[in-house]
Amino acid sequence: MGELFRSEEMTLAQLFLQSEAAYCCVSELGELGKVQFRDLNPDVNVFQRKFVNEVRRCEEMDRKLRFVEKEVKKANISILDTGENPEVPFPRDIIDLEANFEKIEIELKEINTNQEALKRNFLELTELKFILRKTQQFFDEMADPDLLEESSTLLEPSEMGRGAPLRLGFVAGVINRERIPTFERMLWRVCRGNVFLRQAQIENPLEDPVTGDSVHKSVFIIFFQGDQLKNRVKKICEGFRASLYPCPETPQERKEMATGVNTRIEDLQMVLNQTEDHRQRVLQAAAKSLRVWFIKVRKMKAIYHTLNLCNIDVTQKCLIAEVWCPVADLDSIQFALRRGTEHSGSTVPSILNRMQTNQTPPTYNKTNKFTYGFQNLVDAYGIGSYREINPAPYTIITFPFLFAVMFGDFGHGILMTLFAVWMVVRESRILSQKIDNELFSMMFSGRYIILLMGLFSTYTGLIYNDCFSKALNLFGSSWSVRPMFTDTWSEDLLKHTSVLQLNPNVTGVFNGPYPFGIDPIWSLATNKLTFLNSFKMKMSVILGIIHMIFGVALSVLNHIYFKKPLNIYLSFIPEMIFMTTLFGYLVILIIYKWCAYDVSTSMVAPSLLIHFINMFLFSYQDTSLPMLYKGQMGLQCFLVVCAIICVPWMLVLKPLILRRQYLRRKHLGTHNFGGIRVGNGPTEEDAEIIQHDQLSMHSDEEEEFDFGDTVVHQAIHTIEYCLGCISNTASYLRLWALSLAHAQLSEVLWTMVMHIGLNIRSLGGGIALVFIFSAFATLTIAILLIMEGLSAFLHALRLHWVEFRNKFYMGTGFKFLPFSFETIWEGKFDD
């Protein structure tokens, strides 16, 4: 049947790795990515395992690299990514790597420390420069006679009368601009208005030496009288984290200090530039090798983590590991082990030994870039049980098709297809860019799903003859109104009737079915919705029942593969009979009615709903209701009886037969004596010698039969299946409902937006149409493509997860997670 339709055959293998070759062998297995290691030390603490020191050393190197990476990104230097997959370094190379990383880290920390000190000094000098400049302006203003009255308010009137010469003290400093209002109010309240504050903003933002952020600050100068106020002012400045600087009192001293400060700033700026150039050179050199270093260190860390899962034999010369691996890849695994042994220089080969086990292997489905997205849709609901039918190959067709039934629009399908084609054509470039946007990454990983959804939507849009809510007249309508004017429509009828009906029984009115899809004339009909609703509702029922019957049919493939004939006779056959006799018969009735009744006999066509209800009620007394075909009553009674028989068939027989088999095995049971199993069977050849570990393994995992649990389980399954056939069939009506909703939304959008623009007859209509079309395009993409597309996607997903897969899919397995370096060299370090 092909491995595409089932998960890969897996085996449990035991690896015997020589201590000196274990590192290289695990490295080769990581490059291969085909084995899943089992933890053989589940009871051993992580910090007590053999290679914990090596793991810690790798984590320390990883920490240093993250520090370097942070500094590189802070400097806006791009990390070189050539796509190279470097080889794993040997254990002896870890010392050189540690020394190299230690050197880079120490050098960067020294540079950062020196640079921070220089920047702090530069900030202080810059603030002092602005203080000297602004305070000079303050003192110049204070020397203005017009300001004398304002400045004298600090003096008591009695002191002014005595004319005593008083000296005002002052402090100058710099504070964050946003703290000025609070700072000013605090000074006023604490000093009770006995201080004079002047402040001016520094136009250029200053750089914080610690964070590197730009900070807006202001210069202030505070005048006061007395030591008590001076102490209060300094405490307030300290509380608001204001920086105070000494400011000379005379203009000459301030000028000399400003000259010295400017000279020191120029010298400091030169040193800062040289320091930054040196830092840039160090970071640029590190950025060239940073990705390679990350990959090497994290590969080493992954190897040592894996080695900690292994057991060590009593001689301390060999490591024992257990791995799950695909049977088809055993040769490549053997070759990888030989290659690792050769690289290590060991003369003793590593051994791979297949083991017999009753444990359920992990599920491994091989995928490529096309099937990857569809397999993820399957696995999102539940990982398939080992070797059961994989729904992904069928989902490749059925999922986009059911989506398109709900989304069918030729125009919208074309837009979706173009978007998917763009992603497919540019996939190599997009992959190389490593885009971090989660939403786009999710859509890109499902690009082939979107492509098929767009193609199928284009097809169903042609079937519905719907393109942005408008019909396409590709072949010309098969309906003609001309013959109706000859005899049927009178002048009086035309004058007094607003809605006219075309009679297909009149010769020449209807010339046969439209070549492909729905006739475009229906887009003009007032009973368009009535016709489309009937068509889409029946189509949804037909597609849904066929989909479910296909799911039931797939279950027999599982029963055959797992050699469970009891499930074929007691589950598959009654389930198929129940489904086909009731709902398969309904599909046949729908198709039969389409074929048996034409335009001439449509007036006497019976209602399928009434016939289907009467079928379950065995009600055939109403002679006014014509039969669909001869012998209908007998056939329908037979089908209902067959369906009723299937219920006890599924409910009762299987538990009874399982109980009988259990009692028979118990009567012919076996007993273990040491390493020998002796049976009470009809022949003495049934005794076989079995290894003790195999006996204990089998006996531990052998399940005890419980008749009560079996009856309850079978009752639940039977009730769920019988009721599910009804509810699941009704659930497929969502195909009709969402298709109708999509068509109506598309029509409303055209009528309310685009139609208005096309009806503008003035000269400005062309200009207005540009803006109206922009709004129409935006709403089409946002509402009809994204929102409606997501809605149809989720409904199609539900139909596959519930209505389709519950017929055959167990989904109780666990995923095969091989030890692989792929996620590391692809840049997904956190994985």
From Swiss-Prot:
GO terms for cellular component: clathrin-coated vesicle membrane; melanosome; plasma membrane; synaptic vesicle membrane; vacuolar proton-transporting V-type ATPase complex; vacuolar proton-transporting V-type ATPase, V0 domain. The chain crosses the membrane at residues 389-407, 410-426, 442-471, 535-554, 573-593, 639-658, 719-743, 765-803. It comes from the Eukaryota. Residues 408-409, 472-534, 594-638, 744-764 are vacuolar. It is found in: Cytoplasmic vesicle, Clathrin-coated vesicle membrane; Cytoplasmic vesicle, Secretory vesicle, Synaptic vesicle membrane; Melanosome. Keywords: Cytoplasmic vesicle, Hydrogen ion transport, Ion transport, Membrane, Synapse, Transmembrane, Transmembrane helix, Transport. Belongs to the V-ATPase 116 kDa subunit family. This is V-type proton ATPase 116 kDa subunit a1.
